[in-house]
Each structure stands twice: as structure tokens, then as C-alpha cells.
């Protein structure tokens, strides 16, 4: 526990007598800070990184008792707590309160928050339920935790991420450091572009992945403090002043939710390899089974439609069932590469033996609609205001698709934008 005297941190007392007895100097700092502004962030980052490297190494060596001890050491350190508070008070959601309406917007509030991040007696508040629009017109529910719960999740994420990164599937690309959708698409190109590459693709669609992951599976398999994890999973949510329980799924809207989902879905690549052979082995050449996943979207290639439907799909379904998940029968389909398929906003299709990747039709239409909505909303605005609204959307879409064959699509997009800007608007 951290000890304060008149707002000044004077020492740390460990609750674990095996790890420490009595008081000791905070190891991350040569001079303990006495305010938020006096924290040495270089020392904080160095301390956190050092412990994370040790956790990753222990995970690689499968020394799980050491992993647990190092995770406890990290989550009880002042450095990790300061890093967690900094993260939740500097990200985009820093001005969005939870059910308690509390924000940590001042240095004093951030400083006092350090003493509140402890597992003993911790009880998370219910999530504040809001809805955000989806491209198809429906709405997706999102839970907003309180600032304290966000910081606690950020704290435990520091200890969990080294484990998740060490055990992650090789071809998992979503919600991971230094990986992106462009990397996932590049791997698809590697798997499908050659003359003798697989020609059949299983497009996987998981029904409500984040909402349906089994709590029992998470509690049994996620390597972190089980009591804290259980409290997050069972916290429930508030909507229209009414409390609703949560019986399945990860705490959506929370910082730790994507990593929990990744941990649940990781392992499928190894299962596929055990059934159909590791990549670049004799067995894999016969089946041509390759796997690429970004968050809950994934594809699996295969040498034939029959292999994917009769052998691969049952393996995937069994893997998902263990985690409380099911595949959508209508959206999980097997497609020939000559017909093409959409993945992460791109369309991948072979034309006369050559694989071309370009923006998908749905993605383009969604983008054009967004531009049209901005123009219509700003029909009476000054030109500079409209430009300020349009530029981030135009540049964002162009940057996302800059790695693919998009010359024709970009030309069509420019024509549509010009037409929209020149057309008269009826008010």
C-alpha cells in the first residue's frame, strides 16, 4: 500500500510478506515525487518496461508462478499506477465520465487517484450504457466505465499484455502493438497471390463475439488476478436508471476488453496447424490451410471447398463452442478467389491468375455517404469550415487504402465528391 503524508508519498508497504517486509523506498524513483508534476516519467516507463520484459520471458519459459509474482509486483508498483492514470487521463475518452460523473481533469485529482488504485476492497461500478451507430444503420451498445475502473483496467493491462503478446497467434493482427489492418491484408496477399496458392477461402463471422465470450472460460484461462477479473465481468451496466446484470462477454468499452477477446480467440491457429500441418511443411502443402485474423474477423484458406466445409469448419466451430461462441451460419461462407471476398474494407479477387486488392464496394459507398452527410450538414457554412470538416475524412480514407490497387476507385471517388460539392442543396 502507498503511504501519503500531507499529500506527499513517503513509502510503500507491501501486503505480501514474502515479497517485502515493512517499508521500502519506491524503487522506480531516486526521489519520491510529491505531486503529479514531479513524477519522473522516464523512470516510470523504464520501471514498467523492465517488469514487462521479465513477465514475457517467464511466460515464454512457462514459469507461471513467476509470471503471477511479477504481475503482482507490477500492479502494486507506483510506476505502473502512474502510467495507468496517465493513460486514461490523456486518451480520447478523458472527458467522458462513467456512472459516477467523475473526471480526473486536474493534476491534484490525478495525484490522489494513485492511492485509489488497489485491489483490496476494490468494487467496480456498473458500466454506463450508450449506443453508437453502425454502418448498416443499427446501433452497437457500448459500456463506459468510471475513471477509476478505467485506470484499474489500464493497470492490470500492463501486466497482462506481455503474456497475451507472448502466447498470441502468429497471424493475429487486431488490437496488438505495431500491427495493423495493412499487415493483415499483406498476409492475405502472401497466402493467395502465388500461382499454386489456395483458391478457396472460408470467411468467418462470429455472432456477437465481444458480447458472448464465456465468463467461465475467461476466469479459467486468463492469467491475471481472478477476483479482479470476475468483478469486471459481473459489474453489469446501467441504462435508463436501471441496473442490468452481465452473464457473458467482455466489459465492452473497457481498455482491457480487446486483450481479453484476443486471449479467447488465440490458439485457433495452433489447432488448425495440429490438424492440417504447420506452414511450409509437407502436410500444409496438401491442404493449403492458412489463417489470418483481425480482432473477430478472420479468413481461412484451403485447397478445396469440401476441405473447408467438411473438415476445417467443424474444427473452428468446436474451438468457438468451448469459449461460448458460435459462427453465423448465414455469414460464414466459402468463396472461390475468382469471385472475390471482402475483408477489412478491402476486396480481394484473382483476375486471370493475378490477385488484386482494392477498396470494397461497401466501404466506398459508406465513405461517399459520409462525405454527402458532411456536405449537407454544412451547406450554409463558410468554405473553410466545410474544408476543415472534410479533410480528416478524405485523408483518413485515402491513407487507409494507399497500400492497395485504388487508382480507379480514387478517380471515381473524386468525381463523386466534385458532383456532390457542385450540386444544389435543397433546404
Sequence positions of predicted segments:
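A conserved non-catalytic segment of reverse transcriptases
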Residues: 323-397
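Nucleotide/phosphate-binding loop and acidic/charged catalytic motifs
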Residues: 156
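Non-catalytic, polymerase-adjacent accessory regions of viral genome-replication enzymes
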Residues: 1-111
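Conserved polymerase palm-domain catalytic core
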Residues: 116, 120, 135, 170-171, ...
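Short, solvent-exposed helix-loop connector elements
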Residues: 141, 245-250, 372-386, 397-409
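Single conserved hydrophobic/aromatic residue that forms the stacking wall/gate
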Residues: 415-427
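Extended, charge-enriched "interface" segments that sit outside catalytic cores
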Residues: 20-21, 123-126
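Amphipathic alpha-helical blocks
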Residues: 105-124
Amino acid at each position: 500500500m502507498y503511504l501519503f503524508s500531507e499529500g506527499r508519498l513517503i513509502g510503500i508497504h507491501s501486503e505480501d510478506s514474502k515479497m517485502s517486509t515493512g517499508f521500502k523506498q519506491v524503487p522506480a524513483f531516486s526521489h519520491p515525487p510529491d505531486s503529479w508534476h514531479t513524477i519522473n516519467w522516464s523512470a516510470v516507463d523504464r520501471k514498467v518496461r523492465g517488469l514487462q520484459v521479465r513477465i514475457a520471458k517467464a511466460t515464454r519459459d512457462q514459469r507461471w508462478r513467476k509470471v503471477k509474482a511479477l504481475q503482482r509486483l507490477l500492479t502494486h508498483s507506483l510506476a505502473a499506477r502512474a502510467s495507468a492514470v496517465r493513460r486514461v487521463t490523456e486518451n480520447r475518452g478523458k472527458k467522458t465520465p462513467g456512472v459516477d460523473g467523475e473526471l480526473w481533469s486536474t493534476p491534484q485529482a490525478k495525484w490522489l487517484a494513485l492511492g485509489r488504485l488497489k485491489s483490496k476492497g476494490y468494487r467496480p461500478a456498473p458500466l454506463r450504457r450508450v449506443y453508437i451507430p453502425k454502418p448498416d444503420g443499427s446501433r452497437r451498445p457500448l459500456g463506459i466505465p468510471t475513471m477509476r475502473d478505467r485506470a484499474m483496467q489500464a493497470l492490470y493491462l500492463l501486466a497482462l499484455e506481455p503474456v497475451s503478446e507472448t502466447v498470441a497467434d502468429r497471424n493475429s493482427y487486431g488490437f496488438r502493438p505495431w500491427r495493423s489492418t495493412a499487415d493483415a491484408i499483406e498476409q492475405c496477399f502472401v497466402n493467395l497471390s502465388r500461382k499454386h496458392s489456395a483458391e478457396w477461402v472460408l470467411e468467418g463471422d462470429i455472432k456477437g463475439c465481444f458480447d458472448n465470450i464465456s465468463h467461465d472460460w475467461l476466469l479459467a484461462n486468463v492469467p491475471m488476478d481472478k477476483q479482479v477479473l470476475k468483478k469486471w465481468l459481473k459489474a453489469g451496466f446501467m441504462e435508463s436508471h436501471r441496473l442490468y446484470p452481465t452473464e457473458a462477454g467482455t466489459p465492452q468499452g473497457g481498455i482491457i476488453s480487446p486483450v481479453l477477446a484476443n486471449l479467447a480467440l488465440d490458439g485457433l491457429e495452433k489447432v488448425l496447424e495440429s490438424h492440417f500441418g504447420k506452414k511450409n511443411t509437407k502436410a500444409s502443402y496438401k491442404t493449403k490451410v492458412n489463417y489470418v485474423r483481425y480482432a473477430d474477423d478472420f479468413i481461412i484458406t484451403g485447397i478445396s471447398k469440401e476441405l473447408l466445409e467438411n473438415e476445417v469448419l467443424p474444427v473452428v466451430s468446436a474451438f468457438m463452442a468451448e469459449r461460448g461462441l458460435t459462427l453465423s451460419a448465414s455469414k460464414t461462407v466459402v468463396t472461390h478467389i475468382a469471385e472475390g471476398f471482402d475483408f477489412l474494407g478491402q476486396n480481394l479477387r484473382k483476375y486471370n491468375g493475378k490477385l488484386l486488392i482494392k477498396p470494397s464496394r461497401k466501404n466506398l459507398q459508406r465513405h461517399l455517404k459520409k462525405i454527402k452527410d458532411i456536405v449537407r450538414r454544412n451547406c450554409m457554412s463558410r468554405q473553410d469550415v466545410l474544408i476543415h470538416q472534410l479533410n480528416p475524412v478524405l485523408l483518413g480514407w485515402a491513407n487507409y487504402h494507399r497500400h492497395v490497387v485504388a487508382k480507379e476507385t480514387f478517380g471515381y471517388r473524386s468525381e463523386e465528391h466534385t458532383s456532390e460539392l457542385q450540386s444544389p442543396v435543397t433546404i
